Amino acid sequence: MIQALLVAICLAVFPYQGSSIILESGNVNDYEVVYPQKVPALSKGGVQNPQPETKYEDTMQYEFHVNGEPVVLHLERNKGLFSEDYTETHYAPDGREITTSSPVQDHCYYHGYIQNEADSSAVISACDGLKGHFKHQGETYFIEPLELSDSEAHAIYKDENVEEEEEIPKICGVTQTTWESDEPIEKSSQLTNTPEQDRYLQAKKYIEFYVVVDNVMYRKYTGKLHVITRRVYEMVNALNTMYRRLNFHIALIGLEIWSNGNEINVQSDVQATLDLFGEWRENKLLPRKRNDNAQLLTSTEFNGTTTGLGYIGSLCSPKKSVAVVQDHSKSTSMVAITMAHQMGHNLGMNDDRASCTCGSNKCIMSTKYYESLSEFSSCSVQEHREYLLRDRPQCILNKPSRKAIVTPPVCGNYFVERGEECDCGSPEDCQNTCCDAATCKLQHEAQCDSGECCEKCKFKGAGAECRAAKNDCDFPELCTGRSAKCPKDSFQRNGHPCQNNQGYCYNGTCPTLTNQCATLWGPGAKMSPGLCFMLNWNARSCGLCRKENGRKILCAAKDVKCGRLFCKKKNSMICHCPPPSKDPNYGMVAPGTKCGVKKVCRNRQCVKV
């Protein structure tokens, strides 16, 4: 008993080395076991500072050893990780959209640094122990809890000690760039900038970031929503740190999990997937949830060794401010680097060339991904700067939440902060006649300075259209006469006839078999004759209603138009089966589709409206 106690005491005080272990981030062949000790935060008078009643503290300190030397890790909660209007969306088995909007305040995601080290940084989640990475004496170390009986044991290791999951390095899928040679980029002289350009460059910028997790990734983590959300939070927390040096703040405004099947055809052709995701963002996502940039996370393997793709210089574009990223590693840090790389393309950066350098040996925009990447190269910084001055994207000047402000508000920095009614820049630059640039207050008798329902500094009259109806199932939105904002999008009730009685409204759309055939096969494709749909009742055909545990379930006779979608194309068979796909919903009749008189498809059954 005494001997066991002495061993436990030694382990708590002196770290020990390990040769090989399987951790959450992968197989590690050399690591150090440490026991981080929490250090109470003291005020100047030596009295412990009281903090509000929360599960996770705003600031924390931990002491442990690295290579035998003591270090103190300072952590500060990333209060701006979530936008004030952050939402989470997933889908019920019957296709219903389920969105929750409770604010995430008491979370466990931190940024930090090592005490007494100028060039130090840390990205840590403290949900169950300490997990993440920190920079110490110029090297990147990773830390995560060990699954031992002693819950305080942690492993510390370097990225070179993580065994590669595959021999082939992961690369970016971008092949077209905006540079023409491999010559080093010459820095533009600051003297060529106007004062207005300098103020724009220096203004803090914000990206309201929306993440979509596809159905393949959802199933990879066996449908455990809490596991997926925590994984995404860790990635975005790391992403935030990487963009701090560019004066950008990434705020997560929404997380959507396609739990009931993919909303687009996610395929191994990464360019096709990117194009479809961009169209989905423009046509489906933006009408219901504003965001500046969106990324699709998928566990689908793209062709070759590609792990992601993003449009170059496209931020704020409704269709092209997007990227797709493969969840290609157990390590959230590794996937976060891929996310940062693809977002870099949206922000005007190309893949680095041989002449590009950064403080570390490997830069974020390198064509190959490494776990210790944390800096943008000189090329990336210059390309990004030139893109900002050339395109002047405006969506990044809108701060996601007034309540999230940590620093005092600054009048004249182009975004409205606590206590301000407007902000149009400095008095010299302001071109908004509704706003007093000196005070950041509205001019006398002005009611507003911007918004869909603001015109000549006054609210538009009640009844003025501010958003046109998109289709038969959408209502036009009208100004109230009391606000500059356009009211939230509203839809016709589900079940209302649409498109000359070809369909019934469903969540703001009018799904019909003909439209779905055109989407699947291209213009000119039409719904097959009703006889073809009887194949969904025939065990020997490609028809079915759904699959359960890999077993094909046929439709009942009354439900045949709610199973497999059959279309006819020019010069083709009349009963044309969709091509095979790993996505269980690909080529299936969409929920809400008309399947009879006053009947629609719901959960693969034809039911009354």
Curated annotation (Swiss-Prot):
Assembly and oligomerization: Monomer.
Keywords associated with the record: Calcium, Cell adhesion impairing toxin, Disulfide bond, Glycoprotein, Hemostasis impairing toxin, Hydrolase, Metal-binding, Metalloprotease, Platelet aggregation inhibiting toxin, Protease, Secreted, Signal, Toxin, Zinc, Zymogen
Name of this chain's protein: Snake venom metalloproteinase-disintegrin-like mocarhagin
Annotated ranges, domain Peptidase M12B: 205-400
Residues engaged in binding Ca(2+) 1: 208, 292, 395, 398
PROSITE patterns, A to Z: ADAM_MEPRO (PS50215), DISINTEGRIN_1 (PS00427), DISINTEGRIN_2 (PS50214)
Domain (Disintegrin) ranges: 408-494
Cofactor: Zn(2+)
Gene3D superfamilies associated with the record: Collagenase (Catalytic Domain) (3.40.390.10), Disintegrin domain (4.10.70.10)
Residues the entry annotates as binding Ca(2+) 2: 410, 413, 415, 417, 420, 423
Disulfide bonds listed in the record: 316-395, 356-379, 358-363, 411-440, 422-435, 424-430, 434-457, 448-454, 453-479, 466-486, 473-505, 498-510, 517-567, 532-575, 545-555, 562-601, 595-606
Assigned EC number: 3.4.24.-
Role this protein plays: Anionic amino acid sequences containing sulfated tyrosines are needed for cleavages. Inhibits the thrombin-induced platelet aggregation, and the thrombin-induced release of ATP and ADP. Has lectin activity (inhibited by heparin).
Residues linked to a glycan: 303, 507
Family: Belongs to the venom metalloproteinase (M12B) family. P-III subfamily. P-IIIa sub-subfamily.
Subcellular location field: Secreted
Motif residue range(s): D/ECD-tripeptide: 472-474
GO molecular function (one): metalloendopeptidase activity
Species per Swiss-Prot/TrEMBL record: Naja mossambica (Mozambique spitting cobra)
Activity regulation text: Inhibited by EDTA and diisopropyl fluorophosphate (DFP). Also inhibited by an excess of zinc or calcium ions.
Statement: the UniProt record of this protein carries the keyword Hydrolase: yes
